[in-house]
Amino acid sequence: IGFLESYLHGGITTSISASEVHVPGRPSDPDGVVALAVAAKKSFDNYSPGGMHVHAGAIILEPGLTQKHFNEAARQGVWLAKAGFGKFKSPYDYKPYVKMAQKAGMIVNVHTGGASIPDSSPITGDHLLHMQPDVSFHINGGPVAMPDADFPRIINESKIALQICQAGNIRTALMCLDMAIEADEFDRLIFATDTPTGTGVMPLGMIKTVVEMACLSKHSPEMMIAAATGNNANVYKLNTGFLKRGRAADVILADAPLGSSATTALDAIKHGDYPAIAAAFTDGVPRYVGRSRNT
């Protein structure tokens, strides 16, 4: 309880649901799946923890859903769908459901890597290329990664967005980062946390990902910040992620942390230190100024 506000103190101004899969007694029948997504979407339309923007309500792809179900969910504002948690015999069976969700105007995210909940299956590169979703969730593993040989295939044989997550495999995260940039596909790289999960609740999960990808690679902190902000905004079609007239006034102020050998936030990130977050604004409103609870 209260973890989203704590994430705001970790510099995260927007959260996107990976579906409400852990709701106790979660329904898996088609009508129940739609009802859960709509309820989550409308609840967070009315609730902004600490001022954070929360895009909740992702329809969980389950057998029996029809185009009518997706259209009704979309009519009520649901624009996210999630594959990987349904009771399908094979991940290949997701394809028609992915297409129905996309036809309804939804962005489809797909669990990638080893199975994470009972009744689900590992999802590999073959499955992703068959489904053609919009986003490969935690492509570096959530937390178990798909085979290394699948990464260049996803990068070179599709336009699927590549989500690197904190709660995954750091070796494959760095490998995917290098491969995507070398293939001139940086715009498809997005950062996320994939938390809370069994890995834990990580208010600093996003900034930790930015720091690790910058300090353990040859790439600049500016690029890693772009993967966490503007690239996410472009992939999910959000009015955030850029300092530009007409965009949402969601901004954090950061500096080198007390005691760091670095003198700027960017230098601290490249050095491997978490920057100090001094203030956060959403919708132009200061949510805290002076010091974050978590940095």
Language-model-detected regions and their locations in the chain:
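Alpha-helical scaffold segments that flank or form the walls of functional sites
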Residues: 1-52, 61-76
